[in-house]
């Protein structure tokens, strides 16, 4: 009789563990899809904007007018950058240190403010030809996208960190078409931070 109850209990534990794993995989897929759309559109708009700016530089017919428009555009970017970074301090820089601090539990990021402000400012700044890369912003956009989905799904703090790391990896993969690098990134981050 005791063996029978042990078997029933083991089956229940296995069923619970299986459903938990499946729900985590499902949440990871949702994060990957949504972050892929966010970062994919980020990358696409950067490329289109860069080609537009490049076309303005190459148009010799209206050189003086085009240079005047470009100077005004860069002034607008500087003003918008100052305004947005004053309202949201965590969009400064690459964003990777903020993501690492969030994963370690040292800070909590305002996911929505960072998502839209970093998205808009990143597109304008990188597409305009300023000396910036898309790796850091893509990782931060992915991480805050993962956090937003975790908040929407009302996940536990451990699941939230896992979805943040998954989002960061999805952002890296979408930015550079490098899924293996993203996999290594998330394994290192998750294993390093959650094994303690």
Regions found by a protein language model. Give the residues of each.
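Alpha-helical transmembrane segments and immediately membrane-proximal extracytoplasmic
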Residues: 1-196
């Amino acid at each position: 009789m005791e063996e029978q109850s042990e078997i029933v209990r083991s089956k229940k534990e296995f069923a619970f563990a299986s459903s938990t794993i499946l729900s985590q995989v499902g949440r990871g897929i949702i994060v990957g899809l949504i972050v892929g759309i966010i970062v994919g559109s980020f990358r696409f708009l950067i490329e289109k904007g860069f080609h537009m700016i490049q076309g303005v530089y190459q148009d010799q017919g209206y050189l003086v007018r085009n240079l005047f428009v470009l100077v005004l555009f860069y002034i607008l970017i500087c003003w918008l950058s100052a305004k947005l970074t004053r309202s949201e301090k965590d969009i400064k820089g690459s964003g990777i240190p903020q993501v690492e601090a969030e994963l370690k539990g040292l800070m909590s990021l305002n996911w929505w403010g960072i998502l839209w402000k970093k998205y808009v400012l990143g597109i304008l700044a990188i597409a305009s030809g300023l000396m910036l890369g898309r790796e850091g912003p893509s990782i931060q956009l992915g991480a805050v996208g993962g956090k937003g989905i975790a908040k929407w799904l009302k996940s536990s703090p451990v699941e939230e960190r896992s979805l943040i790391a998954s989002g960061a990896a999805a952002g890296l993969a979408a930015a550079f078409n490098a899924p293996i690098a993203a996999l290594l990134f998330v394994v290192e981050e998750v294993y390093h931070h959650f094994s303690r």
